Every structure is written in C-alpha cells, then in structure tokens.
C-alpha cells in the first residue's frame, strides 16, 4: 500500500483523464489499496492561478477531491515551519509545502517536477 500526495499537475491530469499522466501514476492513483491525498496547497495554487488567468480549472474542485475518493490534507503550523526550513533548491512555495507535507506525513509525491527529488522525498513520476 502506498500513501500518495498528488502534485497540482498530477491532480488536474487525473481529473481530466489527460494523456500526460503516465501509466504507472495512473495505476497507483486508481489502486483502491493506496491512500491518495490532495493538499490544501493544491487548492490554493489552483485558485490563485485561476484568478490571475494562468489556469482554467473547474470551480468545484473540493467536491471532485471527495468524489475521486481522495483525502484532503490540511496545512498545519508544523508543515509551515518545515517548508520554511527547507533548502532553497526550489523557490515555488506550493511545491515547498508539498515537500514538507510529504516529509512530515511519510507520503510519496506524484509529480513530474525535476526539483522535488532533490529534497530526498519519495516520488512517483506523474
């Protein structure tokens, strides 16, 4: 059993059934034995990018998380401290939060981001 944390692009690719999402990631996300989490940071990132016109995404993503059988992952004060303490390999604050959450909660990040593995977290290629 895996505990997966979806990076924003992996979450959106899953919802859209996009061909960009690789077979291994698709199988792992769809495997009911695995726990799949979507971070509050992902909701925040999507909302900001939608508001500034950089992303078109459905409005009801919160419900889509639940309909997909995924779990919400809240951001805690500890996660915030951990994200701030990370080395500056990656400046994206949303990805830094996902990294901190994955480290704290023992999660595998489903991502295509080449910077995330530099932090020593387990990843699965999206």
Q: What does each of the following model-derived ranges do?
A:
Residues 46:
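Phosphate/NTP-binding elements of NTP-utilizing enzymes
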Residues 1-38, 51-63, 105, 114, ...:
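Short, well-structured N-terminal submotif of metal-dependent ribonuclease cores
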Residues 56-62, 67-115, 124-126:
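Active-site neighborhoods of divalent-metal-dependent phosphate/nucleic-acid chemistry enzymes
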Residues 13-14, 49-50, 86-87, 101:
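A generic structural signal for short
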């Amino acid at each position: 059993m895996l505990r997966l944390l979806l990076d924003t692009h992996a979450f959106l690719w899953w919802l859209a059934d996009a061909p960009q999402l690789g077979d291994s990631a698709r199988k792992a996300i769809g495997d009911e034995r695995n726990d799949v989490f979507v971070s509050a940071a992902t909701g925040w990132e999507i909302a900001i990018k939608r508001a500034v016109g950089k992303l078109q995404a459905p409005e009801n993503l919160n419900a889509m998380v639940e309909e997909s059988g995924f779990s919400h992952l809240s951001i805690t004060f500890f996660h915030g401290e951990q994200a701030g303490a990370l080395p500056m390999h990656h400046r994206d604050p949303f990805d830094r939060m996902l990294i901190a959450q994955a480290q704290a909660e023992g999660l595998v990040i489903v991502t295509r981001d080449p910077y995330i593995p530099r932090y020593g977290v387990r990843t699965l290629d999206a």
